[in-house]
């Protein structure tokens, strides 16, 4: 559209010529520009400069685009007397672009009235310079590296706590299984709700679930309710309510109270929270449940074959994840995914601390809730050493931990600690015990190998963890009931546990992952072993995966070997054929299927058919069908699965919602820090962050999963804009705090687009450079070219334009217009003419 406009103007050619000659002087004839009316000042044009004013420009800092915004330029003169345009940038802007403004107090406003003209004096930074490239609409800044903050460091003043809003995430699943032999059926239902409230820097969060299976009645359970906020000057965070103690020094415990600790996400060199990946193999369509500290935190339905769940968000507690896979035929398998905590190693001068006071919060309502307290401190010493100490206390338990960690350079990080604990189980005498722990982790950059190892050695039978001791105290009953309360509470009998995770990139030959864990107990309790080997390979557009998993639980060993292959059909990447082979304890399964996506990956589908050989289901077949939709307002999916003995139907729905001052906005689940995209009145627009998420009919959408305390570019896809909408500035930057919902607001001009030739009542054309806009609406102002033509957007069907080429009454006029279908071209552009009075 704009290319069409250029064809009607010759000023573009003049601009290009002046750009080529640089600073060379040249002259315009005012009579040629304004048809004999020389009231327009062209002295600046004659010297190769443009008129002062406000321009939408790209700001380029040391070769990188850092912003696109309106900048005001005023006229200045060089020492030689040559006029030029000087930008008016603020200290806040320079700080936002990465300049260390606090190191240069002379930057403060260069103009006399600093309140109305807060322009900085860029000359205060030695060797700093600027150049306004008018014809590229670029303000090019050159600032020495010494004047910039370290990469990744962002001033606190730029952190955005976002808007006040109520938010809700929801997940729901219902499945019904029919047993063909006896005609019976079993229904299972599950609802997970995550309501929240953002109020300034405060974040209020809750997790509540309801589950029901078979003849058992439904049960509600609240995993946590808490309020938290950042204390930015201390780079810390305070939490009030129900949460979990950190698991870096002691085993994590759920508590109700107050917690204050540092927030590493606020540090420039932050290390993001570890999020484990849960891998396993389902023999049939199965329900996967994941618990942590006794609380159900995740539930989903997976198809037969290997599964990999990377969207499991733990409680940040450091406690292991207990995974249970419920097969369609009633069988189940269980295993533990260790929540690996990296070695404790800090840089010199870095401090990490955490303070907790409150009461124990067990998942079982029968367990007592005594007061608990915990304090931990770690500090980075010289020589790459880290010292740390911690204390954990309750009515029946006291433990002290101390250790030393070190950064070993190219050899990774290592830490070792010893914990002395005094424990008193219910109706038993106090006992003392010690435990040693060694942690090691390393990433080999050259070979792209990651390795982590955790070894805990319990040297005496008197050592126990706090949660195991407190679980033995019930509000009713007597005796040592710990095994009845939590079958996994065996720290008193645990002698040694070790876990290791190795990841190896093989380049074009794929990726190999190995995870292993072993728990050894005293007495008759058998050891638990878990080993998984996973290999993935991409060959062209096909995908190959080989997995071997062994879980030893009690006296039973489960060994599962799986091979999966996916190959695109017909050269298209949205439809695949698949084959899967699974071998488990003497039985073999072979499955073929097809799956794919459509409608920009919004629709997903799969059809699978399997044959089973070996006991007990030799010769049996099974099949499944799945259909899912990932929409702008949420996700929905349906599943059908059958075998000779059962038929199962299930449905899933999930999504998120935000209530804000402009109303209700629906979307997919809100994952942590988010942005509310605002394009008022324009629906169906996406951003480059996620092409699947479109603005609703009011022009709003939710984009989540942003990293806190980091800058993000939110860019509109202009191809999605309807013909009657135009957005001058299609990108904006946001820098949210943890859990914030920040605004990315865009200002569309909605209405018709027109090229209008404007003449004055005396027959003269409008002076070149005049501004034309709707009366009382300067946002859609257009510049009149030398032929009196102006390109206008956002026009209503009828209206009045104000044309100005000066401040005096004789330097402005008004023109009425009315859009007519006869004046509309094939491209949707109206060709208008009008007389300005």
UniProtKB/Swiss-Prot annotation:
GO molecular function terms noted in the UniProt entry: fimbrial usher porin activity
Record GO cellular component, one term: cell outer membrane
Domain of life according to the entry: Bacteria
UniProt signal peptide: 1-23
Cellular localisation: Cell outer membrane
Membrane topology type: Multi-pass membrane protein
Similarity remark: Belongs to the fimbrial export usher family.
Stored PANTHER family: F1 CAPSULE-ANCHORING PROTEIN, OUTER MEMBRANE USHER PROTEIN
Protein's UniProt name: Outer membrane usher protein PsaC
Function: Involved in the export and assembly of PsaA (pH 6) fimbrial subunits across the outer membrane.
Pfam families documented for this protein: PapC_C, PapC_N, Usher
Keywords of this entry: Cell outer membrane, Fimbrium biogenesis, Membrane, Signal, Transmembrane, Transmembrane beta strand, Transport
GO biological process: pilus assembly
Gene it is expressed from: psaC
Organism of origin: Yersinia pestis
Positions of disulphide bridges: none
